[in-house]
A protein has these predicted regions:
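Secondary-structure end/capping motifs
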Residues: 225-309
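Bacterial signal peptide processing site
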Residues: 18-21
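A structural signal for short loop-to-beta-strand junctions that line the ligand-binding cleft
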Residues: 37, 94-102, 125-128, 204-211
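Pocket-flanking alpha-helical
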Residues: 47-48, 63-96, 107-114, 162-171, ...
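Ligand-binding "clamshell"
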Residues: 88-99, 188-207, 265, 271-274
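Pocket-lining segment of extracytoplasmic ligand-binding domains
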Residues: 154, 159-254
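Bilobed "Venus flytrap"/periplasmic-binding protein-like clamshell domains
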Residues: 28-55, 112-188
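C-terminal motif of bacterial Sec signal peptides marking the signal peptidase cleavage site
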Residues: 13-16
């Protein structure tokens, strides 16, 4: 009897140890993301990384510096760039996949107060920024066709377009009626012209026409990053973005690492203005900066529809990080 008792005790002990070992084996190990190198352009995408400002592996560069980072020793693990540029880079053979979309449109059309009937008509002077090959013009013609081509004028960049809205005049002094502009430049320009006002939310116009959400900045992950690490990074990014949307003071605190002129130099924007805009809602009920998070593969149809505006082909699932 004593031998049976000892045998049962040992058996229970072994079972307990085995159970403990099994439990220890199934506890997921936290993935270290601290060594991942991240590069974003200055501007709106920085808002998504408000909690990474003090991360020594996170860099912010001017938009025109991104193209040199797709290859070579300086190419980061995570690269944020506008969707179309990234898809074209992949088509040209760079070692990345598209992983997520983090901005969903911050374009608006504002009136300067110069249009007597306050209704956009053929012949009204309308300012776009960039040139005929850039997103504002491509998007404009997708939404409005050629009806207003007679009055279209182009400023070199968003800052000059903002100046046109603030003054009511094109850079050569010509009076203008409407200005196509992005946030947060719109916010600042409206403050400078008491007659100016919002005329159309381009995100809403796009949604009504296409039935889909607009897409702008995308996250690309280098192929050398394994699936577990990449997905852990995306999960953390989604959580931090959603937290800031729920509580904009988190973004405000994160961006507060730099202040004044140094902040503008670091981020490419005045953080006080951006947080103000971020707290506002657009016509679709989303934050006015268009910040959000969706895994790219989950909205492939939206991506393909957006790319079609540029005459680009439907994407293959092979270029998506999963």
């Amino acid at each position: 009897m004593k031998k049976i008792f000892v045998f049962v005790s040992i058996l229970l002990l072994l079972c307990g140890c085995a159970g403990q070992k099994k439990e220890e084996e199934t506890v997921p190990q936290e993935i270290d993301l601290s060594s991942l190198t991240i590069v974003t352009p200055k501007g709106a995408p920085v808002l998504a990384f408000y909690d990474q400002i003090e991360n020594e592996n996170y860099s912010r560069v001017t938009a025109d510096a991104i193209s040199a980072l797709w290859t070579g020793d300086a190419s980061p693990d995570i690269l944020v760039v506008d969707l179309t540029s990234g898809i074209k880079a992949i088509a040209n053979g760079v070692d990345y996949k598209v992983a997520a979309i983090i901005t969903f449109g911050n374009f608006y059309l504002a009136s300067t107060g110069n249009d007597d009937n306050e209704t956009m008509d053929a012949g009204d002077r309308i300012v776009l920024f960039g040139n005929e090959n850039m997103l504002p013009n491509k998007l404009w013609h997708y939404l409005y066709g050629e009806e207003y081509d007679e009055g279209l004028l182009f400023e070199a960049d968003a800052q000059q377009a903002a100046a046109a809205l603030a003054s009511g005049n094109y850079s050569d002094g010509t009076a203008v009626d409407y200005v196509f502009l992005a946030q947060p430049a719109l916010f600042a320009a409206l403050k400078k012209n008491e007659n100016a006002k919002l005329y159309a939310d381009i995100q809403e116009v796009y949604k009504n026409k296409s039935g889909l959400d607009m897409i702008q900045a995308a996250v690309f992950i280098k192929n050398t990053v394994d699936s577990a690490t990449g997905n852990a990074f995306l999960e953390k990014l989604e959580q931090s973005i959603n937290a800031a949307i729920e509580d904009p003071s988190l973004a405000e605190a994160g961006l507060g690492v730099y202040t004044g002129d140094e902040a503008t130099a670091q981020y490419g924007f005045n953080p006080a203005v951006v947080v103000n805009v971020f707290k506002q809602k657009n016509a679709l009920g989303n934050n006015a900066m268009g910040l959000g998070f969706r895994k790219a593969i989950d909205i492939k149809s939206d991506i393909d529809a957006f790319l079609s505006i540029f005459g680009m082909n439907e994407t293959s699932e092979e270029i998506y990080f999963q």
